[in-house]
Amino acid sequence: MAGLRRTLEARLVDAIVLAPHPSLMEELARLRSRLPAMPIVGYAPFRADDGELMAECERQALTTLAIEGVDDAVIGDLVVRCSLTTVRRHALADGPRMLRLVERLQRRAWDLLVRDVERPMRTLDLACQLEVSREHLSRQFGAGGAPNLKRVIDLTRVACAAQLLQNPGYRITTVVRVLHFASSSHLAGTVRRIANVAPSALGGLGPRGVLVAFARGNTRSRV
């Protein structure tokens, strides 16, 4: 578990996969209390006589269980379906409608931005993934009353920060580190522009709340 704690402090983790064992249950309980919104998948060669262990996994609110040797072919899909990215995508499902992203290019860009939040997406990199020029992407993304691309990039990253901060185990300094903000003040300024709140209020908003706050009046840069 020490290695897992170090990873959580250093990188954006989308889900935790571990092999439950009776000796780990106490530490797993502490982990779950710190990270109640983090998907945790139990993956082990469970046997018929492991009923008590599986019941303890349920008590510790593991997201799902998979049986090693039986579910091997689908474990990747199981993890993706319960990952933070998938949960965040569902929370932001109304984003295209609320932000007037009606064109195919706008929606394709949105899908990539919701997924790739660990680092600030460069417009050129996004354009390359979409196989268009940087200029075309910047011009077309903001068409039809949609927000400009830079603000939507910030929106998706602030939504992820809000998702992480729903967990008591994530401090603001940790979120700054794992999402590669330059500093705590950089995060605070971005959060203020996008959601008009302090970072300490993000956990209460969650990703959906960030989207709603943004759509209510923060879609355009202030002069």
Predicted features and spans:
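Acidic, metal-coordinating helix/loop segments flanking the phosphotransfer/catalytic sites
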Residues: 1-15
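A short, hydrophobic beta-strand element within the central beta-sheet of small alpha/beta folds
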Residues: 17, 37-49
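Short amphipathic alpha-helix used as the core "switch/output" element in two-component signaling
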Residues: 25-37
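Alpha4 helix (beta4-alpha4-beta5 surface) of REC/receiver domains from two-component response regulators
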Residues: 46-65
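Receiver (REC) domain switch/output surface
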Residues: 53-56, 69-88
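A short, Lys/Arg-enriched amphipathic alpha-helix from helix-turn-helix/homeodomain DNA-binding modules
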Residues: 95-120, 129, 152-170
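Basic/polar phosphate-binding segments, predominantly the helix-turn-helix DNA-binding elements
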Residues: 123-152, 178-198
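Terminal helix-turn-helix DNA-binding modules in bacterial transcription factors
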Residues: 124, 143-182, 205-223
